Amino acid sequence: MAKTIYIAGLGLIGASMALGIKRDHPDYEILGYNRSQASRDIALERGMIDRATDDFASFAPLADVIILTLPIKQTIAFIKELANLDLKEGVIISDAGSTKSAIVATAEKCFADKSVRFVGAHPMAGSHKTGAASADVNLFENAYYIFTPSSLTTPDTLEEMRDLLSGLHARFIEIDAEEHDRVTSQISHFPHILASGLMEQTASYAEEHEMARRFAAGGFRDMTRIAESEPGMWTSILLSNRDTIIERIEDFKSRLDEIGQAISKGDENQIWNFFNQAREQRQAMEIHK
């Protein structure tokens, strides 16, 4: 049976998701919300969506599934708005936020007495590119699509979401919202801090050592690629997971101090072990491409 899907947020993630849904469910009607007229026009012209609006509340009552692919603060605000709308009985509401605890807690509170099935989600895919113009049907190919079930999630909710998103060709997995935030603080959020910090440090250093800009090559490029990511999104992510991220920063500072002391003392064995352990751990770790 054909369904009506409402994707709020037609940036890279939302627009790519629309393409993936269309691939396996061409009969589904996809509605799209975005404040930007340009993004709405691109999504319509490329057939990602069937109808578009800049009034979020207008399409919500029509949808069987609502997916919020928005910054975290806006996702939380829209969850609160949805709680006051006359939605379809048994509607599924999900999101694509990079942190989950605050979003899931808000949904559980707002929809506690509603016939809403909410499941948090985080597709672990992305790019330094942004906007509907950069949408790619293969963006989620073989990437982890993490579900963080709530007290409002039923077994059939997850089954329906997996079917809806089958065209993304992602790898679906479930994890507790708080554990999700702990894990992603280390392997996603903190690396962005490192990349941006290294970029800022190098730019400052290059003011007196001009050749630093010219000599930057492969290793520097690889380590700083994600420093091109959208600042607003990452500000929102860090502030929504601040305690866990501060723990990661403090832990890393202590590790930097250790290797700094080893270099200062000329401790060849400790320095060699530092690099060798990292090399072995990197080789043993399953790092998704």
Segments (PLM) and residue ranges:
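Conserved short alpha-helix immediately C-terminal to the canonical SAM/SAH-binding motif I
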Residues: A38-S39, Q74, K100-I103
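Rossmann-like NAD(P)-binding element
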Residues: A57-L87, V91-I92, S98
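Internal alpha-helical scaffold of NAD(P)-dependent oxidoreductase catalytic cores
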Residues: L139-T224
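NAD(P)+-binding Rossmann beta1-loop-alpha1 motif at the extreme N-terminus of oxidoreductases
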Residues: M1-P61, V65
